[in-house]
């Protein structure tokens, strides 16, 4: 029976961006299903897990974060703007849009849209809290424009809240986190361990 990975992430997270396509490739190669679960990291997960938004971290931690982002971007050959114009940014609307697409078009389309939105922040200096940017992302992925309206539905909001709570219940405290049968792999730098776990079946 194929394994399922619960993929908890935030569309505004640089670490989610750096791991996104590699994770997708690993899951596909292993024949694993992906549950696409964008979560309210700053509003729900951090307050109960001891995490802090970047701006509230000690200066030393903020500085080293930039060092690590640069290192991993270079190591992985992925372009990344270390200090994008629109960051910090509220990722709630982008997360809800991903959920709306997941509900209607499925996980493959949702993963593709998530990639587009992450690149918008970390490569293209676009503002993912701007409805025009979200609409453009849908168009780039050839997804229905009406998903923008669906993203504001009660169904989507309830799913967003439920997924954020599920992350907390699973012990998730940061993004990205990949959970397989209750086992957490936190961070894009743990994808090798996830790959080994999926290979075990």
Language-model regions: role of each:
Residues 3-32, 37, 103, 112, ...:
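C-terminal cap of thioredoxin/glutaredoxin-like
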Residues 11, 17-121:
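Structural alpha/beta surface segment adjacent to cysteine/selenocysteine redox centers
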């Amino acid at each position: 029976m194929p394994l399922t990975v619960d993929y908890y992430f935030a569309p505004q997270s640089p670490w989610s961006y750096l791991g996104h396509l590699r994770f997708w490739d690993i899951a596909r190669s292993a024949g694993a299903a992906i549950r696409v679960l964008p979560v309210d990291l700053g509003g729900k997960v951090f307050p109960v897990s001891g995490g802090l938004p970047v701006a509230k971290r000690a200066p030393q931690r903020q500085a080293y974060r930039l060092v690590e982002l640069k290192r991993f971007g270079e190591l992985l050959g992925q372009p990344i703007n270390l200090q994008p114009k629109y960051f910090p940014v509220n990722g709630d609307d982008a997360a809800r849009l991903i959920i709306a697409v997941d509900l209607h078009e499925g996980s493959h389309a949702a993963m593709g849209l998530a990639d587009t939105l992450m690149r918008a922040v970390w490569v293209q200096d676009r503002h993912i809290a701007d409805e025009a940017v979200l609409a453009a992302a849908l168009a780039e992925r050839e997804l229905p424009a009406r998903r923008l309206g669906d993203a504001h539905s009660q169904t989507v909001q309830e799913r967003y809240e439920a997924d954020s709570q599920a992350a907390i219940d699973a012990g998730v405290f940061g993004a990205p986190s990949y959970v397989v049968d209750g086992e957490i792999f936190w961070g894009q730098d743990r994808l090798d361990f996830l790959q080994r776990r999926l290979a075990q079946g």
